[in-house]
Amino acid sequence: MCATTIQTNRPGKKPTQQTNMSDYRSITWNDILTHKQLSDDQLTWDLDRLRNYTAVTNRGNTFGNPFIYHYQLANMLDCKRHNKKHLRDLFHDPVEYERLIQSTIKKNRKNRIPANDIFECYRMNTGSISVFKASTAKYIYKKYSAGRVLDPTAGWGGRMLAAHVLGIEYTGFDTNTNLKPAYDSMLSRLNDSRLAMRWEDCLQAE
């Protein structure tokens, strides 16, 4: 039997509890979709970490990533590696899902909720969806004294988030309009008039 301990330093910390193999089998697809959702206090906490990060060196930390996952995880889950099965397909295939559970238990990741165990194991097995870290973007902006950012492929929003905490103008372009609802929610939460998204090909923009 595999047991993991749930621990977190985020605001709204949940009580420590033990989970076992049966907990993995009780996970629903909605649990996978929502397991990185944060409270308003947790979103603020993550933004404050990014804002207070000096970015004198590029340490590659994950400040800002939880904020991005909160809004973009469903979109990330729509992506899959070439010739690899989608997590949704594995989830709805009893045989394949059992294999994923066994692989997850074997890796026995610590300090994670069960849905995240499964998500992280899938990423390790098939290759992860890359997020351009907001902390790295902040480092670059500061190093080159950026006063305005034109982002031709906005992606998941890390570069926009870095511009926000530095108080500089940002205009992002992306042709994937499936991302628009998530970006609209991010922009509403940030409430920053210096940030703008344009849903068109940057090469065709005027």
State each model region's role.
Residues 1-64, 68, 81-206:
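Class I S-adenosyl-L-methionine-dependent methyltransferase catalytic core
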